[in-house]
């Protein structure tokens, strides 16, 4: 084995992640060690992650440099990144909140990475601060493609058990099983808002609570504002009626252009949400 483990960085449902070193070159890397179950074989999440990450080469996507397999373990070798965005905010933020220039910089990098995924017909489906990694040069990269999916033509019927609850789009929460790149854009909007305040935008405790938190801020949708919403499995005609709040009041650090982009990403109706490419062309990124 050409790599030695230096320290444990974390663990997930099916893998442990270590800081490691290439014994030959001395390069510091991240090692994701996946247990292979004797009965079940390699987890489908690992197979998906490997196949997608081998194809997705971009400065804002974590690069997978090697895959090594033994009888009961699979080891993925990634470039080493110092912190995830959550830890970065906790370390350098003012009570977690980052300065406006940094929010803009990280939002732009995040949009570049996710737009590249979307151009290559891949949905990430699990964007959250813990899955965005930052290195010592301030480069932000998308990681953890274990839930990612290729977009089929026509749109596949995907499972609605995706994306950590707080970053989950309202259409997914309402049980829609036909969705596209717009679910990732919703997550980007939630992350952009969280970077500005240091707090998750919608920290719901369950599916319905999550929806009501969204409606409290953005207004309760109706059949008029979102045609077809009443047909979604989790829609209830008894949802409380909330009026949309003024985002400028909640996000005093955003200028009008920043607020405009945030609103475009957080449109309740998925078809009305901006795309990654359009978001990158937004005037907010053209101002200092």
From Swiss-Prot:
Residues 3-285 form the Protein kinase domain. Belongs to the protein kinase superfamily. CMGC Ser/Thr protein kinase family. CDC2/CDKX subfamily. Its EC number is 2.7.11.22. GO terms for biological process: negative regulation of sister chromatid cohesion; regulation of cell cycle phase transition; signal transduction; traversing start control point of mitotic cell cycle. GO terms for cellular component: ascospore-type prospore; cytoplasm; cytosol; nucleus. This is Serine/threonine-protein kinase pef1. PROSITE patterns: PROTEIN_KINASE_ATP, PROTEIN_KINASE_DOM, PROTEIN_KINASE_ST. One of its GO terms (molecular function) is protein serine kinase activity. Interacts with the pas1 cyclin. The modification Phosphotyrosine is found at residue 14. It comes from the Eukaryota. It is an enzyme of class 2 (transferase). Keywords: ATP-binding, Kinase, Nucleotide-binding, Phosphoprotein, Serine/threonine-protein kinase, Transferase. The modification Phosphothreonine is found at residue 13. ATP binds at residues 9-17, 32. It catalyses: L-seryl-[protein] + ATP = O-phospho-L-seryl-[protein] + ADP + H(+); L-threonyl-[protein] + ATP = O-phospho-L-threonyl-[protein] + ADP + H(+). SUPFAM superfamilies: Protein kinase-like (PK-like) (SSF56112). The active site is at 126 (proton acceptor).
